[in-house]
Amino acid sequence: MAKSVPAIFLDRDGTINVDHGYVHEIDNFEFIDGVIDAMRELKKMGFALVVVTNQSGIARGKFTEAQFETLTEWMDWSLADRDVDLDGIYYCPHHPQGSVEEFRQVCDCRKPHPGMFLSARDYLHIDMAASYMVGDKLEDMQAAAAASVGTKVLVRTGKPITPEAENAADWVLNSLADLPQAIKKQQKPA
């Protein structure tokens, strides 16, 4: 049996990149300051990096799945060029009220459901209790809780923080950029 590894689960829009709303083109994709360095440091610390992102714009007809895949490939290569290798990218193209029939459905992968997390856990042998979820919305925290992710981290770089999201989170940080230091501080012996 493969040894399980801890992971950092990462929402995309508002966590890795600035959320300009239905981001689907390279020209509109802007990495948030400090996140690439943080991701590199988290890899050095022994974490797998796994993106888990709702992409309802596909179901809503705002952009195609092919456009999303092109942008995702570009993001993955951009990170790899900066010595950040993602271990997995999981996305949900569905929405119950989508205008594109193929993707109009209730599914178990759309956050707050844990489907993407559980798929990653099984495929990558992730130790969920030792893992972290980083996101900017309540649904990110709820999905992480449903998947038994050990630490739920809410960041201020995306949507405005709601009291519900703050209550569902274990930690609230200004940015993903602050996570490596926060983990190191927590792991220091008292």
Curated annotation (Swiss-Prot):
CDD domains: HAD_HisB-N (cd07503). Substrate binds at D11, R12, D13, D19, H20, G21, Y22, T53, N54, Q55, S56, R110, K111, K137. Its EC number is 3.1.3.82. The active site is at D11, D13. One of its GO terms (molecular function) is magnesium ion binding. The record marks R110 as: Contributes to substrate recognition. InterPro entries: HAD-like_sf, HAD-SF_hydro_IIIA, HAD_sf, Heptose_bisP_phosphatase, Histidinol-phos. Signal peptide: none annotated. This is D-glycero-beta-D-manno-heptose-1,7-bisphosphate 7-phosphatase. It comes from Escherichia coli O6:H1 (strain CFT073 / ATCC 700928 / UPEC).
